[in-house]
């Protein structure tokens, strides 16, 4: 998995929960591409699933991914083509589920405060840097420990475990 991304921002507020990310009415499927068709459907941007482009980046406030422990939520985001989610903070279970399935997530409160809907940004996960291309300003994000970077580079926890087992 690449560790640098560039995309247009979709800005969301605080407390975006898993029901907003992927509504419960779609939990009868485990097809990630079907889930992606409905991502963010019950959020403040219900048009997101139909109007976002592959590579667009979600930027949100605090407590992103709160609510029920639903692995469908990060899966829907990942398979919709969103390469990274930036937020002030993440619900802990969402954080872990995202890492496990290989969806990069970044905590950067200052960046969230200043980046606007529609801005184009660059994200470098290895350096922990976010750059707003509209303003030229760079923000330091909370950098992942090497172990989490390795899991993300592998594409998720299962892929990482397979790599580790194969190398023994």
UniProtKB/Swiss-Prot annotation:
Q: Where is the signal peptide?
A: none
Q: In which pathway does it act?
A: Amino-acid biosynthesis; L-leucine biosynthesis; L-leucine from 3-methyl-2-oxobutanoate: step 2/4
Q: Write the protein's name.
A: 3-isopropylmalate dehydratase small subunit
| Presence of the UniProt keyword Heme in the record | no
Instruction: Give the Enzyme Commission number.
Output: 4.2.1.33
Keywords, comma-separated and alphabetical: Amino-acid biosynthesis, Branched-chain amino acid biosynthesis, Leucine biosynthesis, Lyase
Q: Name the domain of life this protein comes from.
A: Bacteria
Q: Which SUPFAM superfamilies match?
A: LeuD/IlvD-like
Question: What HAMAP family does its record include?
Answer: LeuD_type2
Q: For this protein, what reaction is catalysed?
A: (2R,3S)-3-isopropylmalate = (2S)-2-isopropylmalate
One GO biological-process annotation of the entry reads: L-leucine biosynthetic process
Keyword Lyase listed? The answer is yes
InterPro entries (alphabetical): Aconitase/3IPM_dehydase_swvl, AconitaseA/IPMdHydase_ssu_swvl, IPMI_Swivel, LeuD, LeuD/DmdB_bac, LeuD_type2/HacB/DmdB
User: What family is it from?
Assistant: Belongs to the LeuD family. LeuD type 2 subfamily.
State the NCBIfam families in the record: leud, LEUD_arch
Q: Which organism is it from?
A: Aquifex aeolicus (strain VF5)
- A GO molecular-function descriptor: 3-isopropylmalate dehydratase activity
How this chain assembles, per its entry, is: Heterodimer of LeuC and LeuD.
Function statement: Catalyzes the isomerization between 2-isopropylmalate and 3-isopropylmalate, via the formation of 2-isopropylmaleate.
């Amino acid at each position: 998995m690449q560790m640098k991304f560039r995309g247009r921002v979709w800005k969301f507020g605080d407390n975006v929960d898993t029901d907003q990310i992927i509504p419960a009415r779609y939990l009868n499927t485990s097809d990630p591409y079907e889930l992606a068709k409905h991502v963010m459907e019950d959020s403040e941007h219900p048009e997101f699933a139909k109007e976002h482009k592959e590579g667009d980046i979600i930027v949100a406030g605090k407590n992103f991914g709160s609510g029920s422990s639903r692995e469908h939520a990060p899966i829907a985001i990942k398979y919709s083509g969103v390469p990274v989610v930036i937020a002030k903070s993440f619900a802990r279970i969402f954080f872990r589920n995202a890492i496990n399935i290989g969806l990069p997530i970044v905590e950067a409160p200052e960046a969230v405060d200043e980046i606007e809907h529609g801005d184009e940004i660059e994200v470098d996960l290895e350096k922990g840097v976010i750059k707003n291309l509209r303003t030229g300003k760079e923000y330091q994000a909370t950098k992942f420990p090497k172990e989490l970077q390795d899991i993300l580079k592998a594409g998720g926890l299962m892929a990482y475990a397979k790599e580790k087992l194969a190398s023994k």
